[in-house]
Amino acid sequence: MSIDLRPVSRPMKRCCVFVAALCAAALFSQQSYAQRSGASDRLNENTLTVVSSSPNGTYMPIAYDMSAVLDDGDNLRILVVLGKGGGQNIKDVRFLKGVDLGIAASNTLGYYRRTGELGNIDDKIVYIAKLYNEEIHFIARPEITSIEQLRGKKVNFNFVNSGTQLSARDVFDRLGIKVEETNYGTADAFERMKTGEIAASVLAAGKPAPAISAVKAADGFHFLPVPLSKVLINDYLPTTLTHEDYPGLLAPGQTSETIAAGVALIAYNWPKNTDRYRRIAKFVDAFFPRLAEFQKTPRHPKWREANLAAVLPGWKRFEGAEEWLRTRSQVSQVSPAERGQFDQFMAAKQMQPAALPQSERDRLFQEFLQWTKARERR
């Protein structure tokens, strides 16, 4: 067979160059698309949303603190969503597809459990951690000196489906005091209180609440004392507002009794083998070991009340959070002999515990426990 060695024509050369250029462009495009696709997948896999509150509430600064401390580029990102507060936040976590986490008060969870308004939420909503106690502020006009005097008068319960609305309804119902409910934002309610249209306003928010810090005694308003009574004791805690909390409304040394409810970080109860579960578990692994960072300036002072081991009675904790706490408990109870064995275990893996993140050390300790159990069975 003979081989044709005739020179290639100039048009054919141009055609070959063009085809080669197309192939190179296609390859570059595929590589570029793969890189963009990988970055997009990584960003989506490691981003969580947390629904908070309006700027007047405490939930929003608490959620923004999570974002400020935990954001780690594409590895973990916290998107803060403005919300209406506890009641609506529970609905959003329960039903909205794009919401991973929410901040809500325990008494609003109890409200939905009692009413069945959201169906059976016992197996749908889990809590990750109790964060702090949320004070319920009762602010009244000067002629109102007791909560009983609000009977039959207009009282603002904040926005519809807010945590304040549900808390205020619950408290007045339990006390047997029937009032006329209004649903304005706190600032609007204060303006209507000045004209006498509204007698009082309620706000459930961790102290010091910005919307109330702006109020002065010169405006004619004052805190209405609401001590803890027998009808409230199962779902509320006694607390005190002080001059240090609200210098504009309370004189030095002056205090006002009120009630509070526990606030928790909640999530939907995703099955363990789902991506949404994995995402929340990753958040827990980042959040729990760094709680001490949240309890320092400039973070919200309410973080100083947080205790990861605190329970929310009657509610199930997210399994990934429960596992983390169980592991930490086991680590804290390690004997000196076991600590030496663990060090040997780490040395065998050529690892230095101090150089690893806490979540990785905890994972390795679990592996160590399994290793020791396997040795004991031999």
Enumerate the predicted regions with their spans:
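Bacterial N-terminal signal peptides
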Residues: 16-27
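Bilobed "Venus flytrap"/periplasmic-binding protein-like clamshell domains
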Residues: 45-70, 78, 134-191, 195
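N-terminal (or domain-start) structured segment
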Residues: 35-103
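Ligand-binding clefts/hinges and TM-proximal coupling segments of bilobed small-molecule sensing domains
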Residues: 160-171, 238-313
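Pocket-lining segment of extracytoplasmic ligand-binding domains
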Residues: 106-107, 116, 177-275
